[in-house]
Structure formats: C-alpha cells, structure tokens
Amino acid sequence: MARKGSIEMKAKEGAFYAKILLFGEYSIMCDSMALTIPYSHFQGELSFIHEDKYTDQEFAEESSQSLRDFYNYLHNINERGEMFFEFDLNRLKLDIELGMYFESSIPQGFGIGSSGALVAAVYEKYAVNRILPDSSIPSEKLQQLKKIFSKMESFFHGVSSGMDPLNCYIRNPLLIKPDSSIKPVGIPREFSKSGGIFLINTGKPGKTGPLVNLFFEKCKEDEFFNRVKNEMIPFTNQSIEAILKDDFKEFFSKLRSLSGFLLSNLKPMIPEAYHSIWQHGLDTGTYYLKLCGSGGGGFLLGFTEDIKAARQMLKSRDVEIITVS
C-alpha cells in the first residue's frame, strides 16, 4: 500500500493515466531494479466518434483504424491458440464498427505509455473475468497481468515487457526487482520542501525499436557490458533503494552518478541539442537529467532539490519544464 504522503492515483473507471519509468530504462533488460509511477497530467479513455469530445475527426478516425488493426491482431492470436486469456472479441469488433476510438492526451512516442494506456483500457472493458486493479493485489496476480499485457502490447512494439500497461492499469507506483517480482510501493510526493521531479519536452518523438537494438548490439561488447553491470545497474538500484527509504542525500549522490553514466555511455539516446544542458546540470548540481523511456526524443526526466532554481536555470537556456511531483 502507498503510505501517507506518497504518490498514488485514483481515477474514474475507464480513464487511464500515462506512466513514467523513474528508473530502469535499458538497465532493466540486464536485470536491474526498476521503478515506475502513474502520471495524471496525461490520460486517455475509450470513446465514440459521435460523442461530444475535444479530439478532431481525423485523429479519431485514425485511432479507430488503429483499434481495428489491434482487434485483428487479438483475433489472429486467438485463432492460433496463443491467447491465454479470455476476451469478448465480438463486442470489441462491434464497438469498433460503431466508431470507437481512444480519446487521449498522451503524446505518442514520448516514452510515457500511450500504447500502455490503450492496452489497459481495452483489457478493462473487454476482458472476461478480468483481474481487478488494487494497490494490494497479490504478486502472482500482478505477474499474470504482466504476461497478459505483454502479449497485448507486443502488437505495438514487436516485443513488450507488459510493464507500461500494468502501471497504467494498477494506477500505483510499482517496484520491479531483478527476480522479476513486482509489488506496489509508496514513494514520497516531494523530495524536500523545494525539490521535485520534472519533464523536459525535446519537441520530437523517439523511436524505441532502433535504440533498443543499438543497446543490445553495444552489450555484445565486453567493455560496454561490464560498465552496464558494474556501474549503470548499481547506480540504478542504489537510487531506487535510497528514494524508497527517503534518504535523499544518498539518492542525489547516486542519481548524479547515474546521470553522468548515461551522458557518457548512452549519448545516441540523448538528443544532441540537450547534451550541454545535461552536462550543465551535472556541473552545477542544480538538477540531474536522465532518460524517460528509450530516449532519442520525447521527454527527458529531471530531478532537483530546488525546483525554483532548476526552472530558472533551464529557462535561461530556453528550456521549459513540466512538473511531475
């Protein structure tokens, strides 16, 4: 259960928030811990084109076509006997024919779970005997949901861990351990009276597939893989452990090391225009940046002990921030 004063989300049934992977991008593929949170600034829900919604007609029609393609994927894996969960595919097909689409403010390709929210919404509405979301849900149920969501979201990414839809569906911070166990956790809303988490919009979407492939190719090099194992993973795990213990002196120490590692070793994942901005945070200690998802564009994730100072410093470099917590 999330403790008092921690990040947790409550939303009406049918509405699904974006998610932010605070820690674990790339390193989770090499068995690090990971920590993910819901982000209520963006959300989406299934709707119908004829309803009075803010989405323009063109977007709604494109979204409806995407849902049609998603239905075909689900239908095909069901026909092949690969769907190990029961769906009301007939009702899904009928609703798509009636003009259903995904009404969403979650930007696509920005690393905050646009497809995850859609998958969670479809599961909630059309799964038969679905597992109900709850912050105290047993670990075995979380694993079962993760497996289901992995199969569903693979339509969008080719391969999916299922973590994005799981976070969108549970609406609670989740800790993923190296043994793949998952549990809801409580994390503080604020690092201090003046600190916080923020996003930077790089202005263009990223492409997950090519960057993930690049990381795997780099991991075939012994020198790079050893750095991942001996530096990136410990910095990630130690950052997570510190934030969960409210030890913010330790947290910012390990976060600085992780941020420096990312800039030195994963530069292709960081838009070139932000290399100097990233380094400036490391040099001054006013803020520290890291990837938000696979990178290459989308959002960057920032942490600071003084949100006002970070905002002013970044604004002087023509960078606006979006506060997360």
Question: What residues fall within each predicted segment?
Answer:
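Detector for intrinsically disordered, low-structure N-terminal pre-sequences
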Residues: M1-K4, A121
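C-terminal nucleotide
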Residues: R3-F23, S27-M29, T36-I37, G44-I96, ...
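Gly/Ser-rich catalytic serine loop of serine hydrolases
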Residues: S105-A117
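Glycine-rich beta-strand-to-loop/alpha-helix junction loops that act as flexible
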Residues: G113-S115, C292-G297
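Stable alpha-helical structural segments in soluble proteins, enriched in small hydrophobic residues
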Residues: A117-N129
